[in-house]
Amino acid sequence: MKYELQKTDGRARRGRLVFERGVVETPAFMPVGTYGTVKGMTPEEVKETGAQILLGNTFHLWLRPGQEIMKLHGDLHDFMQWHGPILTDSGGFQVFSLGAMRKIKEEGVTFQNPINGDKVFLSPEKSMEIQYDLGSDIVMIFDECTPYPADWDYAKRSMEMSLRWAKRSRDRFDELNNKNALFGIIQGGVYEDLRDVSVKGLVDIGFDGYAVGGLAVGEPKEDMHRILEHVCPQIPADKPRYLMGVGKPEDLVEGVRRGIDMFDCVMPTRNARNGHLFVTDGVVKIRNAKHKSDTATLDEHCDCYTCRNYSRAYLHHLDRCNEILGARLNTIHNLRYYQRLMASLRQAIEEGKLESFVEYFYGRIGKPVPPLSPQLTD
């Protein structure tokens, strides 16, 4: 993988990630294909929304169908028939979200398989081996996702263990002679001093890109913005920056303003299945009765298959009847909305008009523009 930085506007960056399997224009949003599928969508449909890279879930694919089934097909690309780049998370977040079902030690994490109750062990080394078999174009290190709230002492211990695990991940990745990219994950909770230690430690080890982890876990938005403003300038400018698990359209805009290049989130797909649709003017809850006889398109600014062909009334009808097609059409639209938003952000950075676009974006959804810290507006 090669990262090319093409243009900046304030802290925002316009670039591209070049892989053997294709080019990803950044800032980029990655749809989530947890079990080797973006729910309800064929790979061709996902590609038509404008997506250039997907996220797969190491934890879930390891438990089912397992490494052996994956290897029978070649790798995850062949298994799911997506031939563009794939980033896989390390399984860390899923393991730590199991709560009482898991036990953390220096060696790794022992937990109860949520599918069949078996006792399972996942370590940095094992995560690297699974992701190697998946053929991931971007491999994520195995880390502990520090929960929120966490006091300074807990966040420090967690971050320090994540650093040790980062080194073990790097070592096993290199032993496997994996020629793909490996990203480090910056931890440290909402504490700037701990984030500083994490960034320095990861940069000293050396990675192909750097993710900001442990955000979007319940902390106030102001804390997320503060940490991003503090951390992003410390990440080497020639490496991509990835904000994990984020998020709402506003979060993508704010991440880009602060220097983030890559995002992923289940929100567009999960919300689509619940009839919660993102449009230029905010959100449409398609189940609401006011859409029953609305012949208008969902979003007049959108060029997706759904908006080109169907009315709000039809989407409302499908939702009320719990028809599978409704969930599919909603998903097509939400994914296209996210990709159009990213394309607009890229264009605005290219033209040096990012803040003008930000004002337009918030004006359409009827919200004030969140302030940048003074050093970002100098």
UniProtKB/Swiss-Prot annotation:
It comes from the Bacteria. Binds 1 zinc ion per subunit. One of its GO terms (biological process) is tRNA wobble guanine modification. Substrate binds at residues 89-93, 143, 187, 214. Signal peptide: none annotated. Pfam families: TGT. SUPFAM superfamilies: tRNA-guanine transglycosylase. GO terms for cellular component: cytosol. Zn(2+) binds at residues 302, 304, 307, 333. Keywords: Glycosyltransferase, Metal-binding, Queuosine biosynthesis, Transferase, tRNA processing, Zinc. Its cofactor is Zn(2+). Pathway: tRNA modification; tRNA-queuosine biosynthesis. The keyword Zinc applies. The active site is at 89 (proton acceptor), 264 (nucleophile). It catalyses: 7-aminomethyl-7-carbaguanine + guanosine(34) in tRNA = 7-aminomethyl-7-carbaguanosine(34) in tRNA + guanine. The keyword ATP-binding does not apply. Residues 245-251, 269-273 are annotated as: RNA binding. Belongs to the queuine tRNA-ribosyltransferase family. PANTHER family: QUEUINE TRNA-RIBOSYLTRANSFERASE (PTHR46499:SF1). Homodimer. Within each dimer, one monomer is responsible for RNA recognition and catalysis, while the other monomer binds to the replacement base PreQ1. Catalyzes the base-exchange of a guanine (G) residue with the queuine precursor 7-aminomethyl-7-deazaguanine (PreQ1) at position 34 (anticodon wobble position) in tRNAs with GU(N) anticodons (tRNA-Asp, -Asn, -His and -Tyr). Catalysis occurs through a double-displacement mechanism. The nucleophile active site attacks the C1' of nucleotide 34 to detach the guanine base from the RNA, forming a covalent enzyme-RNA intermediate. The proton acceptor active site deprotonates the incoming PreQ1, allowing a nucleophilic attack on the C1' of the ribose to form the product. This is Queuine tRNA-ribosyltransferase. It comes from Yersinia enterocolitica serotype O:8 / biotype 1B (strain NCTC 13174 / 8081).
